[in-house]
Structures are given as C-alpha cells and as structure tokens.
Amino acid sequence: MNFLGTYTPKLDEKGRLFLPAKFRDRLAEGLVVTQGQENCLVVWPTDVFMEEARRAQATPMTVRGARDYARVLFAGADEGALDKQGRINIAAPLREYAALDREVVVIGVMDRIEIWDPVRWREYSAGAQAKFAELDEQPAHTSG
C-alpha cells in the first residue's frame, strides 16, 4: 500500500497525532519518525526505514555528505507504534524541529508520510507547484 493524499489532522496537547485511517494498516508493524528535509518530519514504516538505513550504511563514511545524512537520520529518529486509537506520539524534540503546533499537514509520499507545519507546507508547496508546472518537457524522475 502506498501513502497518498493530503490531510489536516490536529496534534493533541500530549503530542499525539491521529493518522488517516487508510495509512494505519501499513504502520501496524511499527514505525519510525525522523527529521526530514525542509524541516518536515518523516514517518516511515519500520521495514522501509530499515531499507533506508541499509542504503545510508552502504555509502562509505569517508564521504562527508553520507556522514551528515546518517547523523541527522539516526540521531533524530524515534521508534514508535500506533496506539489503539490510531495515533502516533511525536516526541517534543521532533515537534520543535518541525515547528509543529496544534495544526499540521500530513501528506502521503508513496513509501513514507511527511508531517508539516501548515505555513511551511504552503510556502514549500507554492514553490514546488511552480517548478512542477515547468516540467512539461522532461519528467522530474528521469535523468538528463
């Protein structure tokens, strides 16, 4: 199952977030929340996170960018699980990193979920939409 769509659930006062019902089955075996690029959070099913971890570890640590990526990915990671109500707990340091308050935007990005502050999402999305509109000659996922 892929994660698709945009949702606007709310964080409660304890940092718990209801995830869309259609996302929950894929996370039943566990999840990992990490810092993402552009100051969002990434929610990975545990098995997908482990694949990402293997890729990160396969890159020689003599490559500075690989070291930086691994440090950010693993140091900020928080293992978790859905509670009986379908919520995940987002640790305070992760909420602070992403500037999350009560209002959040949750987006499905195929194999992972991203959680955004609404203002940051609108700013990022506006720029990304403009770039997307310019991709009429070559799909973004292909190389030169």
UniProtKB/Swiss-Prot annotation:
<keyword id="KW-0804">Transcription</keyword>
<dbReference type="InterPro" id="IPR007159">
    <property type="entry name" value="SpoVT-AbrB_dom"/>
</dbReference>
<dbReference type="GO" id="GO:0003700">
    <property type="term" value="F:DNA-binding transcription factor activity"/>
</dbReference>
<dbReference type="InterPro" id="IPR035642">
    <property type="entry name" value="MraZ_N"/>
</dbReference>
<keyword id="KW-0238">DNA-binding</keyword>
<keyword id="KW-0677">Repeat</keyword>
<dbReference type="GO" id="GO:2000143">
    <property type="term" value="P:negative regulation of DNA-templated transcription initiation"/>
</dbReference>
<dbReference type="InterPro" id="IPR035644">
    <property type="entry name" value="MraZ_C"/>
</dbReference>
<dbReference type="InterPro" id="IPR037914">
    <property type="entry name" value="SpoVT-AbrB_sf"/>
</dbReference>
<comment type="subunit">
    <text>Forms oligomers.</text>
</comment>
<dbReference type="GO" id="GO:0000976">
    <property type="term" value="F:transcription cis-regulatory region binding"/>
</dbReference>
<protein>
    <recommendedName>
        <fullName>Transcriptional regulator MraZ</fullName>
    </recommendedName>
</protein>
<dbReference type="Pfam" id="PF02381">
    <property type="entry name" value="MraZ"/>
</dbReference>
<dbReference type="GO" id="GO:0005737">
    <property type="term" value="C:cytoplasm"/>
</dbReference>
<dbReference type="InterPro" id="IPR003444">
    <property type="entry name" value="MraZ"/>
</dbReference>
<comment type="similarity">
    <text>Belongs to the MraZ family.</text>
</comment>
<feature type="domain" description="SpoVT-AbrB 1">
    <location>
        <begin position="6"/>
        <end position="48"/>
    </location>
</feature>
<dbReference type="GO" id="GO:0009295">
    <property type="term" value="C:nucleoid"/>
</dbReference>
<feature type="domain" description="SpoVT-AbrB 2">
    <location>
        <begin position="77"/>
        <end position="120"/>
    </location>
</feature>
<keyword id="KW-0963">Cytoplasm</keyword>
<keyword id="KW-0805">Transcription regulation</keyword>
<dbReference type="InterPro" id="IPR020603">
    <property type="entry name" value="MraZ_dom"/>
</dbReference>
<dbReference type="InterPro" id="IPR038619">
    <property type="entry name" value="MraZ_sf"/>
</dbReference>
